[in-house]
Amino acid sequence: MNMCGNIKNIYYFCTLKLSNRNKIMRNIAILGSTGSIGRQTLEVCAEHPDLFSVYAITANRSADLIIEQARQFHPEVVVIADETYYDKVSEALSDLPIKVWTGPESLCQVVTAEPIDMVVTAMVGFAGLRPTVAAIKAQKMLALANKETLVVAGQLIEGLCAEYQVTILPVDSEHSAIFQCLQGESIARGCFPWLANDNANPEKPHYLDNPIDKLIITASGGPFRTFTMEQMRDVTAAQALKHPNWDMGAKITIDSASMMNKGFEVIEARWLFGMNTDQIEVAVHPQSIVHSMVQFSDGAIKAQLGCPDMKVPIAYALSYPDRMPSQINGKLRIEDYAHLTFERPDLERFPNLRLAFDALAAGGDRTCVLNAANEVTNEAFRRGQCKFLQMAEVNEKTVAAMPFVASPSLEDYFEIDAEARIKAREILGL
């Protein structure tokens, strides 16, 4: 079924696709199937083989794991992006009727395959931008876990979603929470124009079209929430990788420790939900039970609560607009939580969050530059090449050193990203 047509038809498409379960199975392509989100997405698919067929899986260079996944799920296509590993994967799967692709264009090629209904962008970092754009232009539904796509090029992606009438479903727990809080509200903003009430009265006051006062994105605070600046000076990557609540990949776990991940989620929320920067707040919530909140113009607040298990937002995105039973590690018992606490983030101890707000407010290419610098400093910290607090210092210096580009094109973003990485490495002395 083609998603062409007016915007109102997109909601109908989503509803039809999952309500008629006895007749229609959703074909899924998972970009980054060997990462944390990719593996958990496959687990959700395995729990519901009557609803989801894994059509394609991709990895950069994790050859052994993608071979194992291919033998379990029997996809039509396997992509190993790094050509160095093509022979190994191809030979290992030669006894199965599976196409094995490789090379820099293979990701963009696979997302355009006609049988694919939904693309799950589970890969990490800037590398997710080009295949995400290709999937949008192919009018595929997107389950977006690659937040860097919107961090780098949110305005571009928002415009493409409107042009190609494509549905983006957030996989991040915080944005999934906000998305769930908006169900039933008359709102048509950001990447969700189809949330509007089709029967809305065109004569009603304009303010009723924007009932949102602000979004409140929660943050655990990470492993160093209570550390002083002095204590954080010498923390190690091993310490930073011990997140108190969530099981995530290495890059995002370090970003969570520095609160850059929360900064990126602020930027992502701005584009997903069409908010102004001053309509987005961050609240540190150490228990990670309230995943995010929406405050409306009448003062009411909606919140989505649940155990910190990424399979819940993954399953919600895959099955939207329905909900599926999920084999999560225990459902929330609210009586077990006598106290849920919230506090303001400390921008002096966690300057990366401030940098994200500043870059978003500045506009243009600033968020792209910040993301590029952060990918360099994050990796350098994991390799022991820079200190924990040095990451934010280098990120800020890189943004300040790069010339401002007000309206980047898609190709501009790739040039800006490359130049910002060079500058960040230069500042680090690498």
Regions found by a protein language model. Name each.
Residues 1-3:
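Methionine residue identity
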Residues 5-6, 11-15, 19-21:
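Short, positively charged and aromatic/hydrophobic N-terminal segments
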Residues 22-430:
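Catalytic, metal-anchored helix/loop core of enzyme active sites in primary metabolism
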